[in-house]
Amino acid sequence: MLLLWLRALCRRFQHVPRRVPSRQVSRGSKASRAGWGETSKSSVKWKQLEHKGPCFAPAYEPLPDGVRFFYDGKPVRLSLAAEEVATFYGKMLHLECTTKEVFRRNFFSDWQKEMTAEERKLITHLDKCDFSEIHRHFMERAEARRTLPREQKQKLKEEAEKLQQEFGYCILDGHREKIGNFKTEPPGLFRGRGDHPKMGMLKRRVMPEDVVINCSRDSKIPEPPAGHQWKEVRSDNTVMWLAAWVENIQNSFKYIILNPSSKPKGEMDWQKYEVARRLKGVVDKIRAQYQADWKSPEMKKRQLAVALYFIDKLALRTGNEKEEGETADTVGCCSLRVEHVRLHTPADGQEHVVELDFLGKDSIRYKNHVTVEKLVFQNLQHFMEDKDPRDDLFDALTTSSLNKHLQDLMEGLTAKVFRTYNASITLQEQLRVLTRAEDSLTCKVLAYNRANRAVAVLCNHQRAIPKTFEESMQTLQKKIETKKAQVAEAQVELQKAETDLRMRGDSKSKSFLQKQQRLLKLEEQLARLCTKATDKEENKQVALGTAKLNYLDPRISIAWCKRFGVPVEKIYNKTQRERFAWAFNQAGEDFEF
């Protein structure tokens, strides 16, 4: 297992950043240290970096005596380690994931590892475990927190602010910058996204001995909690993270980094979108080249061209190389297998349709029927000939060779740049088509969400339908029906007032105008409710936020807001506005991506 882990680290970070001599190396070998960090072509990113280190999750608080765990109908007093893991499961009893066999199996396996020998001998079947008292205890605690008096809520708020002031800021080159995630993630059960094969596994508590601290040589080294020491303290000014560790579920790196609203992060965002804008100038040439390569006599060149077509047209990720069984069976473009692709042979003038069905990033299922060019279809037929379902579709291609090809096409070009470019262009074009100047504010916001939805569909940003969706839709529908009745009543009152006016031969009275204004107001309210219901229904399975935060140039949205008189608060919440503060001055109403 150790060998597999080390090999995975080497592949994950193909280039080892320039080592800066660390002041303290307390644990870990050179091999384990080599993978820490994100690499960058630019060398020095800061001269001074000082911070307090991460804020660790509080120690486990044992259950009160009146809250018991039962096995086979009998109360069992668990050891502290086993009890803590039991509470993780008990808290989640109301969630659907605890009914899934994979979740239950993984949880029970990891839970038994935390038990004493006596507990393992006694507790052998999850079905005989009763966590109901534990679940009720935590539900009551949550309800008590919700109903706290205002004074106590204010006290908790002040304590959180004090913690923020202590751990939530750093000094970067003389400037006080906000840190994004200064707290380590508390221990619990891994849920993952989609049907992740590791759901239910135990996320272990992050300890100071797991953490690498990064700060400047002349700054004060953060103090670890009493009785502990850091894994390592280093001074690497070629990276922007403040602290890092490896989480135990997927052996992936976790970082404490600056808040997205900080100046350095804003500059990185700007650079990301500027690279995508540069692609706009060469994308036609790139497309012409890969279309020409569909006819190449070289198999590798044809596979490269079809893969690039998928990345461009379908916004697929490249797909990272990994050990067999190392993690979930998730794939990207380069790791597609024959079993992931079905070709629907055209007949009677029908289009060439390819069906793709695989687990993408975070085990989110990608299922799509897409019409492709005839040459792409024919190449796919050839790539799949004489292959078994588990064979690679692009067997002459690797992730590294594809990435190198992208760099040869344009400096800085990656699959993510293609996704960013196509997402931003799609948003801009959809907004142009869907927005009408004469529309109401509500309709304009709906148009924006529909444009955003087109991007989310392109990027396969899905979400599970919220459990409360049906209930909230029923509530909304009742409001609509009530509002319709009020509109109908107001219409009758207005007609009656109009008849009275005609009979008296009067000009419009104050009472008539008030009834007219009331009807208009009610009709506006009804329109807003109907639009909200439409928006809610259309986006019930689509995650709009991912693209908005990571792939859409904010200047497009800000320019659209300015052009059509839409308050930017309708598009971005406060946190998002802070994150994209850099874009507000750059985006006039005539900005074009």
Swiss-Prot record:
It catalyses: ATP-independent breakage of single-stranded DNA, followed by passage and rejoining. Its EC number is 5.6.2.1. One of its GO terms (molecular function) is DNA binding. The active site is at Y551. Its cofactor is Ca(2+); Mg(2+). It is an enzyme of class 5 (isomerase). Residues 1-43 form a transit peptide. Its main location: mitochondrion. The keyword Transmembrane does not apply. Residues 254-255, 317-322, 414-416 are annotated as: Interaction with DNA. It comes from the Eukaryota. SMART domains: TOPEUc. One of its GO terms (cellular component) is nucleoplasm. Keywords: DNA-binding, Isomerase, Mitochondrion, Topoisomerase, Transit peptide. Residues 261-593 form the Topo IB-type catalytic domain. The keyword Oxidoreductase does not apply. GO terms for biological process: DNA replication; DNA topological change. It is found in: Mitochondrion. Divalent metal ions (calcium or magnesium). The record marks R145, R193, W241, K272, T330, K361, N403, H461, K479 as: Interaction with DNA. Belongs to the type IB topoisomerase family. Releases the supercoiling and torsional tension of DNA introduced during duplication of mitochondrial DNA by transiently cleaving and rejoining one strand of the DNA duplex. Introduces a single-strand break via transesterification at a target site in duplex DNA. The scissile phosphodiester is attacked by the catalytic tyrosine of the enzyme, resulting in the formation of a DNA-(3'-phosphotyrosyl)-enzyme intermediate and the expulsion of a 5'-OH DNA strand. The free DNA strand then rotates around the intact phosphodiester bond on the opposing strand, thus removing DNA supercoils. This is DNA topoisomerase I, mitochondrial. The gene is Top1mt.
